[in-house]
Amino acid sequence: QARQHKRKGRESLDCALALQELERLGVNHIITFDAHDPNVSNAIPNLPFENIYPTNTILEDLLQTEDLEDILVISPDMGAMERARYYAELLDSDVGVFYKRRDLSRVVNGKNPIIEHTYMGSDVKDKDILVVDDMIASGSSMLEVGKMLKEQGARKVYFIATFALFTEGIDGFVKAYENYYFDKLYTTNLSYIPKEY
């Protein structure tokens, strides 16, 4: 789930270096789940690289446990748009996306802070929304998106992510859930989630 897959500024390409080191150590096959950027396999062109997506498993569970009506699939940012499109095609639904406008004049915790989220897509009113991404790191963007969708009249909001890291804990998610900013979060056990969560 490494995100050091493309160079920004003077950052290293840690994911590519790690894969090359595994190859030097004699690893002869790489199996991973939902690589942040599957193109990182280009760093090891002579090794088989299997990238397994849990999309269908998550979707099966969602469809068996939820009473979904008018579905709309939404990407929380431009980076997850391909994933959202895939879900939308499987569900024969529309797709929307949030654009993150950032303040490029400053850096906070290694990133340009988000100034605003702008939704681009069809009306969310009375729809069951699936917000899909590969990972939830801190979750602040996902929570902001959920709040905005509910304020715009979404019937239900479901967060779906392969990796739920909760790098800033779950208090924000608990509060957002209590405020009805989202209805349920679907994830996998591919990242460690403490029992108290």
Regions found by a protein language model. Give the residues of each.
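PRPP-associated nucleotide enzymes
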Residues: 1-197
